[in-house]
Amino acid sequence: MNNPIKMLISGADMGSLIASCALHHDFHESSRQEDKFQIYRIEKDTLTMEDVDACDLSGVRYAVNATLHDNEASFAFDEKCKEQGITVIHAVNLGKTAFLAVEKPKGYPFSEVVKKGTDDFRCSLGKYISQYGMFWQMPVPWVDEAIMHYSKESFTQQGIGAYIAAGYCDNILVNLAEGKEVKYFPKFYLSPLLEEI
């Protein structure tokens, strides 16, 4: 019997969806895969520095940051994980869209998305996605629309994007656990509810 993969999920609403997906994942496809995920939770959408200081990272292989990313403590959580060599997955609900980024311990910092003294996190993230798409000549105009909508009214934490993010996050966790390739930040995963093919 192999050891379970220990992971820490921060975030209450979307964090619970991600935990549920991970707990119900079937590893039957791989004979060498560990038995399951062992999940530890910080059930808060807004972290404090006290939460970050108190979280025990011993034995944790992966961390998921599904918080609102609305203060410095959220990014301090990432840094604490990275200092311990832990890969951090960021899951963000953008209404009817999900954004996910995988941050290597020594990779490009996800906190660079938010420039100090500028817009809130989701607006900064929308600008990052839009500029990334324009640079690679793959524009994503619906992201601009989603962010414009968000500036007028906030996203529900349990909206469609949260469910999409939970499913994607589970797939990323399984790929990491099985040693399969994933995209690392500054690359990212972006999934609208429906996309023309």
Residue ranges and their predicted role:
Residues 21-25, 79, 175:
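Short, well-ordered alpha-helices that flank and scaffold nucleotide-derived cofactor binding pockets
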Residues 50-58:
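Short amphipathic alpha-helix with an adjacent loop that forms part of the alpha/beta core around
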Residues 18-20, 154-177:
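Mid-domain beta-loop-alpha active-site segment that forms a flexible
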Residues 1-8, 13, 175-197:
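Phosphate-binding loop/pocket of nucleotide- and phosphate-handling active sites
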Residues 28-47:
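NAD(P)-binding Rossmann-fold cofactor-contacting core
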Residues 4, 58-60:
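Short, well-ordered alpha-helix to beta-strand connector turns
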Residues 8, 61-164:
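E1/E1-like adenylate-forming module used to activate ubiquitin-like modifiers
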Residues 1-24, 29-31, 170:
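Glycine-rich adenosine-cofactor-binding loop
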